[in-house]
Design a protein with these regions (language model features):
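Assembly/oligomerization scaffold segments
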Residues: 1-114, 169-171, 176, 202-211
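Solvent-exposed, flexible loop/coil residues
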Residues: 32, 37, 42, 91-93, ...
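Beta-strand secondary-structure signal
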Residues: 48-52, 69-71, 99-101, 226, ...
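Charged- and aromatic-enriched interaction segments used to assemble
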Residues: 94-217, 375-376
């Protein structure tokens, strides 16, 4: 067992890193960290971790190696499993450190190129489950998906890319939660699991917000989407279209055109076009808050009620990303990235160009007025 640095200020009882050391040939637990950064992000193909250890007396020198298997637990709940990508030894100002960085189990699907071939009559559920099992992801949870008539695997195409295209054709999402690979819909309209507040009366206070950043961004918002597929004659044919009529009527023209994977002419392509238009709008409002890391675990794919009296925000948000961090200056902080819930976005989409078309309220609102105007 490596020497543990005797520094109670750095001791974090909530976080546990287990490493299966190839060099030492055993299972080791690490409880003390100088710094860490753990990203749980629904929109990345593989989540990432980064730990910094104070290496007093060379205590950790032989413990870590690239490709070592690791598991990360917060408050006794598994939040990530994966492998080490990089081990960095460094010293500065007379102190020695080790930085250990890596990604979760899904990284193997990214790092492996598929063998070029032509796949026929593919069952995506079976295909994805078999690939996950072959690359070390022990569990899958996949909604029923339609058969794919044909898929040509190109040279240099990753296993993850193939899975992503199959999932996208079904207008679904994919994500890894600890050791389970999911394909389905995000829980964007469930009842809030958490409530975050700032500036509210004491009887309304919940989890206090330390910092708040709300962005309204037009990048990636489309006025029109057209999905093309190939006809038997070899010519392109339109399979699905969708428009944001408010943008078009107001002279805001931002068209996106893309091709489909299959040519069965199903309603899937119209749904894909609609998703292009709505996805851009639904993600145009992005909220990032920070809180003190708590015993209560905060995870993505859940909703939260956020009330902030400074920006006049009172809405239900969907949690897309959670980052657990620790450093000497700030201590243990949880950063949470969110977008409005489906219901909140539906309300704003229907009211584009008016006060209700935004996530914030009137600057002059009292708290009672803010409380009465909840979105979502």
């Amino acid at each position: 067992m490596p020497v543990i640095v005797d520094n109670k200020k750095q001791y974090d009882t909530n976080l546990l890193l287990i490493v299966y050391s190839s060099r030492l040939g055993g299972r080791y637990e690490c409880h003390r960290f100088r710094e860490y950064n753990i990203d749980l992000d629904l929109e990345t193909d593989a989540d990432a971790f980064d730990f910094v250890f104070k290496n007093a007396n060379s205590g950790y020198t032989s413990l870590f190696s690239k490709f070592d298997v690791v598991e990360i637990y917060l408050n006794d709940v598994g939040i990530m499993a994966g492998r080490v990508d990089t081990v960095t030894y460094y010293w500065e100002a007379g102190e020695s450190y080790i930085r250990v960085a890596g990604r979760d189990l899904a990284a193997t699907l990214i790092d492996n190129h598929a063998l070029p071939t032509t796949l026929q009559n593919i069952n995506p559920n079976q295909y994805i489950a078999e690939k996950c099992s072959a690359y070390g992801i022990p569990r899958t949870n996949i909604v029923p998906m339609s058969l794919v008539d044909k898929y040509v695997v190109g040279v240099g195409e990753s296993e993850m890319s193939i899975i992503a295209k199959m999932v996208d054709n079904e207008n679904k999402k994919m994500w890894l939660d600890y050791k389970t690979f999911h394909v389905g819909n995000w829980a964007m309209d469930t009842q809030p699991t958490y409530t975050f507040t700032n500036g509210v009366p004491i009887d309304k206070m919940c989890i206090p917000i330390l910092s708040f950043e709300l962005e309204d961004d037009g990048d990636g918002v489309f006025s029109e989407s057209i999905v093309y597929g190939g006809a038997s004659s070899g010519e392109n044919r339109v399979l699905g279209t969708s428009k944001n009529n408010w943008m078009i009527n107001n002279g805001i023209k931002r068209r996106v055109v893309r091709s489909s994977q299959n040519n069965d002419g199903s309603d899937t392509y119209t749904a894909n076009a609609e998703d292009d238009v709505r996805y851009g709008f639904d993600n145009s409002h992005r909220l990032e808050i920070s809180i003190r890391t708590r015993k209560e675990l905060i995870k993505p794919n859940a909703t939260a009620w956020v009330i902030d009296t400074i920006t006049k925000t009172n809405a239900i948000f969907f949690i897309k990303k959670v980052t657990y961090t620790k450093n000497l200056s700030s201590g243990s902080i949880t950063k949470i990235t969110m977008v409005p819930s489906k219901k909140a976005n539906d309300e704003m989409y229907a009211a584009q160009g008016s006060l209700n078309g935004g996530i914030t309220g009137k600057a002059a609102w009292t708290f009672n007025e803010l409380w009465a105007n909840k979105k979502g």
